[in-house]
Amino acid sequence: MNSGDSSLIDAVIYNHTLCDGWTNSTEGAIYHLGNTILFLGYMGGSGAYGALYIFSFLAPAFLCLALWGWLTMCGLDVFIWNLLLMLQCLAQVCHLIFRLMRDGLANEEFSALYTAVYLPLDVPVQVFKEITGAGENKVLSLAAEETYAVEGKTPIDQLSFLLSGRIRVSLEGQFLHYIFPHQFLDSPEWESLRPAEEGNFQVTLTAETDCRYISWRRRRLYLLLSKDRYIARLFSVMLGSDIADKLYSLNDKLFAKSGVRLDIRLPSLYHVLAPSPPGSEGGSASSPPRGSLGDPTVIKVDPAPSNPGSGTRNPQPDQGKNPVPKNPHQHWSSDTEMPSGEDSTSLILEDFADMTGSLMDYGHEREYLK
């Protein structure tokens, strides 16, 4: 450290006039009012509205301090600095108000929704305003364990989009999957009905935590989609992606112990997931034949040869000359007539006997999270 720096430090620390004594008098009311408003201003939160709150309080606070410096302290420097700070706060307030009016977003939740979902899709702000306006720019709430829809009772008359929280989806008390933020609550129900049709929910939706969501009435949203093709295509893409995510969330729960994942679209899994008809032992006595058109979830499979040595690579000599055509309408008379002597349901259940993580294994969502 050179001598110049040391002399400056000594001048700051030692070469100054000490206070002879503390005065018992206090500053005027304007000074204390300014500091009180300043204290309240720094209690604002984050985000655009939090900044608007802070600068709206700081501007009158610095105005009071500027008046205090002009009237009480009679100090030009005190007055000028506080006046400059007040002008800067007013400029920030004007900028924030202009930005909020330009964006046209009703609250902070809509702003976060636009930034997270619609901005990556290059959706203009004006289009987003039309979409939220169709839902009356309202954000609805669900308390924990409050029911959004009950299976077989709640009509399908709206479409909702989750902003925060978590929704539990169940069927007859059996947990299916969760709905997370930025997902539709009832996209499958929306796509299952035509505009003129009516129906009820087939699943129960319950709030796992405190939730916030926006909702559109069915008729009003259909009117918007019929008028604007861009919004209609946007909703078509978002709904299709949401339904695919829900299907994959169910599909991810089906996996075997060996690590091989099973596809929920496999026809053979229908017997595992679907309840057996009452009064039937294996679920096959009252089921239609495998080749019938009434069961689209079951496909016809040719039986495996009983002799492992007689495969397609070793045909009989006479079969090469006079091949016997197969009847395309041939099917098993019932599920009990299988080559192995077992009914189809028992065969499928044995195939998936070691399966863990299926839909039938989770009695509660806490087990699903383990």
UniProtKB/Swiss-Prot annotation:
It is found in: Membrane; Cell membrane, Sarcolemma. This is Popeye domain-containing 2. InterPro entries: cNMP-bd_dom_sf (IPR018490), POPDC1-3 (IPR006916), POPDC1-3_dom (IPR055272). Its main location: membrane. GO terms for molecular function: cAMP binding. Residues 275-349 are annotated as: Disordered. Expressed in the heart and, slightly, in skeletal muscle. It comes from Danio rerio. Disruption phenotype: Morpholino knockdown of the protein affects skeletal muscle development, resulting in abnormal facial and trunk muscle formation with defective aligment of muscle fibers and establishment of myotendinous junctions. A severe defect is observed in craniofacial muscle development, where many muscles are malformed or reduced in size. In the heart, pericardial edema is prevalent in the morphants with defective looping and misshaped chambers. PANTHER family: POPEYE DOMAIN CONTAINING PROTEIN (PTHR12101), POPEYE DOMAIN-CONTAINING PROTEIN 2 (PTHR12101:SF15). Residues 283-294 have a biased composition (Low complexity). Keywords: cAMP, cAMP-binding, Cell membrane, Membrane, Nucleotide-binding, Transmembrane, Transmembrane helix.
